[in-house]
């Protein structure tokens, strides 16, 4: 039986998100012929992935107060390059893995282009900055949660979520 082709945009810009992203990609490959576009680390890159020239996974790693300020121009440039890649590749689905403050930009822009959006690792709206729930509701089709109580939180808001489980518990 021929598998349906699925164009997937993904951003997994941290070590832990790289591992989660790679597992999701492998699961998708069981069902679909997957074309990958975006950015990941060594585990995501074990699958063929189209990444814009000049973007490195480590360019998005920032810590503290000064590091983000120094890297901000490059982060904005890389963000524009990735968005251009996703739109020009006509992706079917976007998967943002962790890094919700970075990935929400893509969720917003791609949702306006009728792309299905998934956020893997729920933003901690249940703990702080609960006002982000409106943004999540508007721009993210499915949130994959590491903890069961996060799914319960989204369920009470009538939002789609899926309990993925925490990698340390598996």
Residue ranges and their predicted role:
Residues 2-3:
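Short, flexible hinge/linker loops that cap or flank conserved catalytic cores
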């Amino acid at each position: 039986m021929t598998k349906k082709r699925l164009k997937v945009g993904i951003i997994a810009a941290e070590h832990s998100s790289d591992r989660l992203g790679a597992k999701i990609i492998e699961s998708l490959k069981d069902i679909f012929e997957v074309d990958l576009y975006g950015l990941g680390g060594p585990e995501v890159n074990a699958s063929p992935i189209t990444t814009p020239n000049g973007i490195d996974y480590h360019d998005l790693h920032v810590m503290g107060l000064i590091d983000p300020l120094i890297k901000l121009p490059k982060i904005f440039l890389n963000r524009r390059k990735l968005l251009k890649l996703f739109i020009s590749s006509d992706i079917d689905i976007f998967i943002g893995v962790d890094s919700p403050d970075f990935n929400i930009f893509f969720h917003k822009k791609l949702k306006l282009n009728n792309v299905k959006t998934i956020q893997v690792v729920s933003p901690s709206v249940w703990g702080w900055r609960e006002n982000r729930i409106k943004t999540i509701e508007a721009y993210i089709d499915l949130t994959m949660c590491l903890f069961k109580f996060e799914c319960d939180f989204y369920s009470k808001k009538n939002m789609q979520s899926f309990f993925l489980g925490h990698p340390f518990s598996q």
